Amino acid sequence: MRPALGHPRSVSSASGSFPPPPAAARLQPLFLRGGSFRGRRGSGDSSTSTSTSRGGGGGRRGGGGGSPSSSTGAEREDDDESLSVSKPLVPNAALLGPPAQVGAPAGPAPVAFSSSAATSSSTSTPTSSCSMTAADFGGGAAAGAVGGPGSRSAGGAGGTGTGSGASCCPCCCCCGCPDRPGRRGRRRGCAPSPRCRWGYQALSVVLLLAQGGLLDLYLIAVTDLYWCSWIATDLVVVVGWAIFFAKNSRGRRGGAASGAHNHHLHHHHAAPPLHLPAPSAATAGAKARGARGGAGGAGGGLGAAAAAGEFAFAYLAWLIYSIAFTPKVVLILGTSILDLIELRAPFGTTGFRLTMALSVPLLYSLVRAISEAGAPPGSAGPLLLQPQRHRAAGCFLGTCLDLLDSFTLVELMLEGRVPLPAHLRYLLIAVYFLTLASPVLWLYELNAAAAAAASWGQASGPGSCSRLLRLLGGCLVDVPLLALRCLLVVSYQQPLSIFMLKNLFFLGCRGLEALEGCWDRGNRASPSRARGGYGAPPSAPPPPPPPPQGGSQLGHCISENEGGAHGYVNTLAVASQN
């Protein structure tokens, strides 16, 4: 390699106050150094010409003058600028190894590529953690992608060679979260931040205790019923919900830890070299894609399993609550306890209505407690939610409307405006508790959909089981509510309600979903319709494009002289300086 030009006196004067320029920095191309060529003249590690000009500067500081030396250094600097374009980026000794080392294992490949730069780089330190020389670029790429088996570990962890495949980006490409540096400058990866989501869980327990305690107060204060059974029922419900929250949080923590481990395998990898011939580059890219796909497949399966555990046992929690809540309210509404509440209770029937209405915020707290804890940091707002959480939000809104509809029917009994017979009163109570228990169906649907997505390892979509559950929920809730509304309008001269339009709209939507499911089963072979199904297996990846004709990847745009092992890097350096 051509030695650096410079006056002996100026170099010796600079050696006392500044370290010698590293030899690896002279091999570094412009696009890897960062900044413009003109702006890096005085940095001390950019090129040979800057070391010469620094020597002149040292002479000026040492002797107070030094103008002839500085002018001579400037002239030599301009000469070196013109020569650095045609200067090879890697010594010629490094070019002898690649033809025989392409099919070799990952161990000797970095040694062959970095043999000439080992002695010079031992006395110099890199200026940045993200900078790399051309020898490191060639050696690390060859060790990471062409090394055969074990190349991923050699490139990712550094191995024994000079180049390493570790990424130096400050953020995580998988989740978008900023990477948090650990102690002593080590990187922690994209482990999820321990955001505390115990607020909604605590609110759920408080609402359970408040509603159960008020109903117990009504049953115990105004009657002679035995009070231990009601309090024991409330304690059983609270303990069941606490166990559910504990299992849900434990499953989510396990899924987050496995996802963080698989992110390290997915994110920190070495890219295939850009200067290899076309067949070798295609083989290296296929190996890299295969290794990445294996790690990503495992991570995707674990992530889907964690998503499947997100709504697990939620339907059991709401079912336990519905079973414990129903006897108390039925006992109050079906007997004379309601009249005693109006006479003896502090707030009368208004307090009882508010106690019954606590079911809606309780359902909201349950949905938020199991969905917000697994949400990514940037998923604020309904349009940025995952499909399962989007579906849960829509089902919650529909359940709120159904509960409001059924509660207005129950108020006819509380106010006594319409003299309803006993069988119609019990029918109204039955419809109300069917509506109250309807979230069990869509919570189970979300759990089954997540389990199906975890088994196939892909995103969830509407399947036949979920459409059947939606249609069943519509038949159990909307049909009885609409029938009762029509009966009250015809037989008891009640005015038309806007909830009748709501019932018709929901029934029409669920009927269309059922018809769409039947149509999808008939056209399951269509790729556009099979893309969004639950049970459709993942499609095969498209075949790789055919390799270009010629001896190298850029054989159609560069000459044969530049088509060697490092011709691609030289071409980019010339283009960036022009």
Swiss-Prot record:
InterPro entries: CECR6, CECR6/TMEM121. The modification Phosphoserine is found at S167, S552. Residues 54-67 have a biased composition (Gly residues). Residues 8-17, 44-53 have a biased composition (Low complexity). Residues 538-549 have a biased composition (Pro residues). Keywords: Phosphoprotein. Residues 1-84, 106-129, 529-557 are annotated as: Disordered. Widely expressed, especially in adult heart, brain, prostate, testes, peripherical blood leukocytes and fetal brain. Candidate gene for the Cat Eye Syndrome (CES), a developmental disorder associated with the duplication of a 2 Mb region of 22q11.2. Duplication usually takes in the form of a surpernumerary bisatellited isodicentric chromosome, resulting in four copies of the region (represents an inv dup(22)(q11)). CES is characterized clinically by the combination of coloboma of the iris and anal atresia with fistula, downslanting palpebral fissures, preauricular tags and/or pits, frequent occurrence of heart and renal malformations, and normal or near-normal mental development. Belongs to the TMEM121 family. PANTHER family: TRANSMEMBRANE PROTEIN 121B. This is Transmembrane protein 121B.
